[in-house]
Amino acid sequence: MAQAAAVAKPPAPPRRRRASATPRRLPYLLIAPAALLMLGFIAYPVISVFYYSLQEYNPTKPWRNGFAGLDNFVHAFTEDPLFWDTLVFSAKWVFVEVGLQLLFGLALALIVNQTFVGRALGRALVFSPWAVSGVLTSAIWVLLYNSQTGITRYLADVGIGSYGTSWLSDTSTVFPAAVVADLWRGVPFFAILILADLQSVSKDLYEAAEVDGASRIKQFWHITLPHLKDAIVLSTLLRAVWEFNNVDLLYTLTGGGPAGETTTLPLYIANTSVDAHNFGYASALTTVAFVILLFCSMVYLRLSKFGGEDK
């Protein structure tokens, strides 16, 4: 009977092996080397800047090198008028450039969004300046502003201005001249992003608005503009950060001159470190710029709903 009971006992279920954690960890292991490398490229310069901002470090005067505490920051905020001048000009440059680029970019996007013959070619020509580097843009506009062979001579031929006028050497004209040069390259950025958003607006909305008797202006104000709001806000903040860091175009176009009229804070930092070899003070100025850009980045991430929040 015991034997029969033993035979009737159901077999034990097969033991399952624990799933290996390796497949789940494999993606993280694969990206770990690249992530650590990128972290090193980002973290090391940031830490070095913070460290040297507390030092007096000038390779040409090694006997003066040493710990300076907050002296560099105190000097910047209380004793260096150039710091405040460049900071104010940076704000002016960002405000004017981003504002004009947004307005012209919006108008350009609305134009190329229409149906017309040769639209594809027109879009390619309109967007092509965005692919040009800042240095090459400066080279183009330096030639255009040349007092002997540029547009100033042709304007003088028709009675506008005088011969021999150099817009990049005159304190009264250098700012608008630099603004126009950067507009040529920056406007397509807004036009591309806004055009991409324009093409996602349903045509049914415009047809319904026309049936209701809404004018083109009302359609733009109540349909187009609300739809573009998020794209405009985020692209404006992103472009503001880029314009604040615009060194290549201004450096090659004006060099910060004349008389420091077009020197932004990043350009002042470059001159302080490269020309004056005052790396300690330049690091302190870089820290200030880092805090400003960090604040702008936090605003950008907050408005873009960073972290998976629903729009």
Please describe what each predicted stretch is.
Residues 1-22:
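Short, Lys/Arg-rich, polar N-terminal cytosolic tail immediately upstream
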